[in-house]
Amino acid sequence: MQFLLWSTGLVALLSWLIYTQETQSASCRCRPWESCWPSEELWNSFNTSVDGKLHRLRPAAHVCYGPSFNRSACDNILLLSRDSGWRASNPGVLQDWVWEAGETANESCPVGSLRTASAVNSCHQGRIPLFTVGVESTKQVQEAVRFARKHKLRLVIRNTGHDLAGRSSAPDSFQIHTHRLQEIQFHADMRLDGSNTSLGPAVTVGAGVMMGDLYAQAARHGYMVLGGDCPTVGVVGGFLQGGGISDFLSLNQGFGVDNVLEYEVVTADGELVVANALQNQDLFWALRGGGGGTFGVVTRATMRVFPDVPVVISEILLEAPQAISSSWTQGLSIVLTALQSLNHDNVGGQLVIAVLPNLAVQASIKFFFLDATEAAVIDRRMKPFLTKLSRANVKYTYSSKNLPHFSSNYRQVPDIHSDNDYGVLGSTVAISQQLFDSPQGPEKVAKALANLPVSAGDLIFTSNLGGRVIRNGELAETSMHPAWRSASQLINYVHTVEPSIEGRAKARERLTNTQMPMLYALDPNIKLSYRNVGDPNEKDFQQIYWGPNYGRLSNIKKKWDTDDLFFSKLGVGSERWDSEESDEVYFFSYFYLEGINTLKVARR
C-alpha cells in the first residue's frame, strides 16, 4: 500500500513537471536553433520597419580570423582597439574583452595578443549579440522593443559598452544600440509640462551622448554638469539610472539621480512615456537608482546643470617600493586626514592608487577648491598637511594650478586603452560618515588599503560622497539604498584580468572571495556597494544595492514589465532568471511520504 501511494505520488509529480515544462516554456527566451526564432522574412520585414538599421553582428575582430581574414582590416582593428571612443561606437565590441568572451576558450574572438594568450585559432560569437539595431529615433526603439517582445528574444540595451558586470552583452541576444541618439538641448529655465514651477537651468540629453561631448557643450553655454570623469561613458544609461556618482562634484551637488528632472522611456509594450514628478511617478522613482536596462529603454533624460566656476586644483603625489610598509601607510593616512578635514569645508577630493608592473605603488590625491582663483592662497592652506608628510619622512611632490572654469578640468580627448590586452573587473564599497569622520577613520582606511592584496595594474580610487549627498536624503526621492545618505566615501577597486579564460576565472574568484570580504570588513556600520561598479558575482545584490527599497522596485518592475523583457545581470528581478538571463528559474515543492521537501532548483 505504501509503495502504491509512493508510485501514485511520483507519477503525479512527473505529470505536473511535464505540464509545467510545456506550459511555461514560453517564459524562456527564444534561441536561434528553436522554431520560435524569427525567419529570414520576419527579420527583413523588421529591418524595413526600422529604416534599414538592423545588422547581423559579428565580433569586431572577426576580420583577423579564418575565412574573414583581411590583413589591412585586421591591422586597422588592432590600431583602433585601444581607442575607447571607437569601442563606444562599435556594437561588435565592448570596452573590455572580459564580457565579450563566453565561458569557455572557444567562445571568443579576441583582438591582438589575446589571440595567442588564449590559444584561440578561430573567431566565435561569445557574448556578442547576434543582431543589432543602431537606432536613431524613438520610433525605431519602439519597433525594436515590440519585435523583441513578440518573438521572446533576449534583449540587450547597449550604449557605450562600459559596464563592468556584463550587462552590455549576452549570448544569442538582440541588441538595441542607443549610441546614435545624440540630442543635446539646454534650457535656461526648465519647467515640466503642466507646471509653472521653475526648476532652473537644465539640459536634455539623448541616450547616446557621452560625458566628454556633454561637458564640451555645457562649457560653451557656461555650465558644468554632474558626471563621471571618463569622457566615453554614456550619460543617460547606467550612469544616470544606477545612481550617478561624480568623483568630484557629488560632495557639492549630490548624485546624478538627485538632479534628474525627467526621463523619456520606451516601455515593454513599446509605448513612449514621460516619467517625472507629475506623471508616472512610480517609474520616475524606480529609474532614479533602480539600474539601467531594467524598466525600459530610456531614450533621453533632462537633468540640472550648474554655473561653471573657477577652480584651484592641488595635488599630492606619493610613491613607495611596496604597499605594505609603515611609511606608505602613514602617507596614505595623512592625505586621507586632509580629505576628511577639507570635506568639512565642501572641498572635494579623490585619492587614486596605482600598482606598477614591479608592484611598487603610487598615489595621487587631488583637491578641488571651487570658486577659488589664487593657487598661492590654496598652497598656504595645504601647508599643514605637507608639513605632516615631511615630519613623517614620507616622500612626496606637491603642485597646484588654477583654472578659469571647472569644466576645463574634464578631459576632452579620447580614452586610450593600455596595449597589454589585460581586462578588468571591479567592485566598490561605501565608507560611512561615522567611520571616516572619526579620529581614527583615515588611519583605518589607510591600513585597509595598504594591506589589500593587489596585482600589477590594479587601481584603487575614492569617490567623494558626504556633503550634498547626505543633505539630499531629505529632499530627493530616489530608489537608491537609503544608507547612501550616511556615506562619506566610496572605495573603487579595479582588478586586472590576465588575457585568458583561466585568468578571468581566477580574477573573479579572487575579487569575490578575498578582496571584497576584506573591504566589506573595513566598516561594520554599513554594507553597501555601487551597482554601476559592483562585483559581478555578488550574491546578496538585492540588499547591498537597494536594501529596503528592493520590494517596491520589484513591484514596479512587475507592473511595467510583466514578462521581464528588460533585465540585466544583478538587476531588479534578475533572481528569476539563470546566470545569462535566458532561462527562467522555477522553484517548486512536493509532498513526500515522510513530509514536505523542497526539490533542487530546475533550470530550463
UniProtKB/Swiss-Prot annotation:
Q: In which pathway does it act?
A: Alkaloid biosynthesis; ergot alkaloid biosynthesis
The source's domain of life comes to: Eukaryota
Q: Where is the signal peptide?
A: 1-25
Keyword annotations for this protein, in alphabetical order, are: Alkaloid metabolism, FAD, Flavoprotein, Glycoprotein, Oxidoreductase, Signal
Q: Care to name a GO molecular-function term for this sequence? A: FAD binding
Entries under InterPro entries matching the protein? BBE, FAD-bd_PCMH, FAD-bd_PCMH-like_sf, FAD-bd_PCMH_sub2, FAD-linked_Oxidoreductases_BP, Oxid_FAD_bind_N
Q: Which Gene3D superfamilies match?
A: 3.30.465.10
UniProt domain FAD-binding PCMH-type: residue ranges: 125-308
Its GO biological process annotations read:
indole alkaloid biosynthetic process
* Cofactors: FAD
Q: In the Enzyme Commission scheme, what number(s) does this protein have?
A: 1.-.-.-
One Pfam family recorded for the sequence: FAD_binding_4
Keyword Glycoprotein belongs to the record: yes
Known glycosylation sites: 47, 70, 106, 196
Broadest EC class assigned to this enzyme: oxidoreductase
Quick check: keyword Translocase in the entry? Answer: no
Q: Which family does it belong to?
A: Belongs to the oxygen-dependent FAD-linked oxidoreductase family.
> What does the UniProt record say this protein does?
FAD-linked oxidoreductase; part of the gene cluster that mediates the biosynthesis of fungal ergot alkaloid. DmaW catalyzes the first step of ergot alkaloid biosynthesis by condensing dimethylallyl diphosphate (DMAP) and tryptophan to form 4-dimethylallyl-L-tryptophan. The second step is catalyzed by the methyltransferase easF that methylates 4-dimethylallyl-L-tryptophan in the presence of S-adenosyl-L-methionine, resulting in the formation of 4-dimethylallyl-L-abrine.
Query: Any idea what this protein is called?
Result: FAD-linked oxidoreductase easE
What species does this protein belong to?
Answer: Trichophyton verrucosum (strain HKI 0517)
Gene (UniProt): easE
